[in-house]
Amino acid sequence: MFMRLYMVNGCQVRMCSYHYQDRFFMSRNRGKGTGKAACAAASFSQSFLPMTRAEMDARGWSELDILLISGDAYVDHPAFGVPLLGRLLEKRGWRVGIVAQPRWDSPEDISRMGRPRLFCGISAGSLDSMLCHYTAFRKKRHDDPYTPGGKSGARPNRACIVYSNLVRAAFPGMFVVLGGIEASLRRLAHYDFWSDSLRRSLLLDSKADLIIYGMGEYGISELARRLQSGEPTTGIAGTVRVSDQAEGALLLPSYEEILEDKRKLLEATRLMEAAMHEGTRPLAQAHGRKFVYCEPPAGQLGTEQLDAIYELPFTRLAHPSYREPIPALEMVKWSVTAVRGCGGGCSFCSIALHQSRHLCSRSPESLHQEVRKLTAMPGWKGMVSDVGGPTANLWGASCRLDGRNCQRESCLYPECCPQLQLRQGEYLELLRSLTRLPGVKRVGIGSGIRFDAALKDRRFLDGLVGEFVSGQLKLAPEHCSERVLHLMRKTDFRLFEEFTGQFASLCRKHGKEQYIIPYVMSAFPGCTIEDMQTLATWFRSRGWKPQQAQCFIPTPGTVATAMYYAECDSRGKPIYVAKTDREREDQHAVLYGGKRPGRPKTRSRT
């Protein structure tokens, strides 16, 4: 799927209440479905995890073990985090319910299925709620792809805090755990672009009991097991808690120290980034007299474990209560996830901080099985839109040292690590094997690829261009300035130009009219107006018009955001940072001839 987390900074995507009356069987009578419509809907939706008391009754459940709350609509698809964790918990024998996009003026939606026996899990959704609501220029967004009809306003600002307060009001004394991208990247003191301030750990502001950071399969399963057996919840890998002590932990600069010296945020962020990769020692950060104590990461799943998760009985559909389509589902409906993790380590990218740099790939057999399921679904037209992940052509890649004693910030920058074993030829054969399955007419790559890696295998590149580019290929050079690319930890721009030349040559060889869609960024820390003019000149020299240009958004937790906040590079050297909206808008406008960017009417052609 090409919904990369760093899509926020490479190509990314009215506070009002979304009432459940808009869903045809939701009742305002204490959250219980009533009448024939409710019964029919409950019967129809038994293949989904329950969202109402009527659906619980249809399963013969008197109570839930675990309640999961999400800022996204409920889509029973493995690309959506809360439903995936719900299916995993269900497989392990727990009774799980989901509340999707609850109203935040009352705890009624939260409480409609009753108090869960073990805990409530909360996620703001697939995006940080502030990023979901506001553009790079702090303007309100008018859409939300994770909501029926794509309508904005179905989740609150700072959703984890709001939902946690609702749970406390609905169920006093309930164990509350936060997860998902918002909680994961705000687990320690962080800069918040939307308030232009340093904020404390989300764990303190939300008053939750625990944060599960990163991919949460291990953490949430172990938490359920321990609460069931009455064991302490301390020491679970991949979790964050509040502690009176920091025993055995690596101490980060405190919240108060960062307030005094902004450069301390860079120090803390780089230590957190290294710990996410090395995964051997806990971290602790003082906030006043308390410590936010971060256990080592849970680690990447193995192939068999990953296969088992994606083979859970997902319907791959939105919950039947929704009357309108959910745009995010349409984007991934006919795609399959083949790989997790990304070795790129770009300084602005959230993936390495959430999924880690360690790569894990699914087996060909598991992917074949999932594609066979796609071919049996209503609406199937023969096209697998994507077989990928954060970086499609890193499927099957692995580290010869398994990441042990690795001090690199990236597996691919400044050049490809000699310990990284690429298997792009095997990936190409995987794609070909999928096209031979009954009912499959075509397989495409909707994810982005690393062009620097692709250049290392001419046969892969030839097969990619000749067979698996669906008209457009997404690449992320991000900029052309060597200095800016160094700050981004991105590949030399000359490699991008080499790739475009080979791509054009191979398109001619195969008689195909295909396009490269380059993703570029403005207003990155260290980027000047002159740098943007150079980039705009390059586009004009090729006869291209930028389609996917994103103004840098300082999302919590990344090295680039710390550079923005501190106005220095990762080594502490002062750099220019475009901070005012005017400066940022001016840089972005350079790509469009000094005008505000509109929807491009032409495509970049090779």
Annotate each language-model stretch with its function:
Residues Y18, I69-Y74, L89, Y322-S350, ...:
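N-terminal pre-triad scaffold of radical SAM enzymes
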Residues A37-E63, A73, L266-V336:
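N-terminal [4Fe-4S]-dependent radical SAM core
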Residues L68, L84, R103-W104, K373-I517, ...:
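Conserved SAM/AdoMet-binding glycine-rich loop
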Residues A73, G81, A100-H287, E295, ...:
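Glycine-rich beta-alpha loop elements in corrinoid/cobalamin-binding modules
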Residues D105, T234-E260, A298, R362, ...:
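Terminal amphipathic helices with adjacent charged low-complexity linkers/tails
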Residues D128-F137, L185-R187, E217-E222, A246-E247, ...:
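Flexible glycine/acidic-rich beta-alpha junction loops that bind and position SAM and/or redox cofactors
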Residues D209, L367, L475, A549:
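Conserved, mostly hydrophobic/aromatic
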Residues F460, P525-R540:
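Catalytic cores of alpha/beta
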